[in-house]
């Protein structure tokens, strides 16, 4: 029976400011028209790079999107890697929607832009205080017929 027990969630860090580097994991849902994708997401962000490891709901790694100063790479399980200039173009290829890690990092740390034409209408559905920083636990972003939901299960600041 102990093998079935889930580990208790990690306590939130005490943050004095938004960290330049962090690791977050949780669930990502993207819906556009009739297309709908649900996945587990493990995100590692450093000042100059992002890595998203996208897994099936059962935990099998499906794809990895990495970006840095030299561009971005999409690696799918069992397929050749694809390169592009931007992270967004590869998330569009993978999920049908261009997702900007800079925008999502801002939302994660409590910044939600207004709903100007063409921008995401972002709602922080649930957040927690981590020292002086509000960390979003549940985010809903809508732009046109696209709905993106992110649920953050674990978060930790990293040294950069």
PLM region spans:
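Short beta-strand segments
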Residues: 37-39, 61-63, 82-83, 146-150
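Bacterial Sec signal peptide processing site at the extreme N-terminus
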Residues: 2-19
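Gly/Pro-enriched, hydrophobic low-complexity segments
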Residues: 109-160
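Post-signal-peptide N-terminal segment of Sec-exported extracytoplasmic proteins
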Residues: 20-58, 62
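An acidic-aromatic
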Residues: 49-100
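Glycine-centered tight beta-turn/hairpin loop motif at sheet-sheet or coil-to-beta transitions
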Residues: 34-36, 58, 77-79, 117-119, ...
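Short, surface-exposed charged micro-motifs
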Residues: 40-42, 62-66, 71, 121-126, ...
């Amino acid at each position: 029976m102990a093998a079935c027990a889930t580990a208790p969630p990690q306590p939130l860090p005490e943050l004095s400011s938004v960290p330049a580097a962090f690791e977050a994991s949780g669930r990502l849902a993207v819906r556009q028209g009739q297309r709908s994708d649900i996945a587990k997401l493990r995100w590692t962000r450093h000042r100059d790079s992002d890595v998203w490891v996208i897994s099936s709901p059962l935990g099998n790694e499906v794809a990895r999107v990495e970006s840095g100063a030299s561009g971005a790479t999409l690696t799918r399980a069992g397929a050749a890697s694809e390169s592009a200039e931007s992270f967004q173009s590869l998330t569009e290829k993978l999920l049908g929607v261009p997702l900007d890690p800079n925008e999502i990092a801002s939302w994660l740390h409590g910044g939600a832009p207004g709903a100007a034409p063409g921008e995401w209408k972002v709602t922080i559905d649930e957040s927690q205080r981590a020292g002086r920083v509000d960390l979003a636990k549940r985010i809903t972003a809508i732009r046109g017929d696209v709905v993106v939901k992110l649920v953050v299960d674990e978060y930790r600041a990293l040294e950069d």
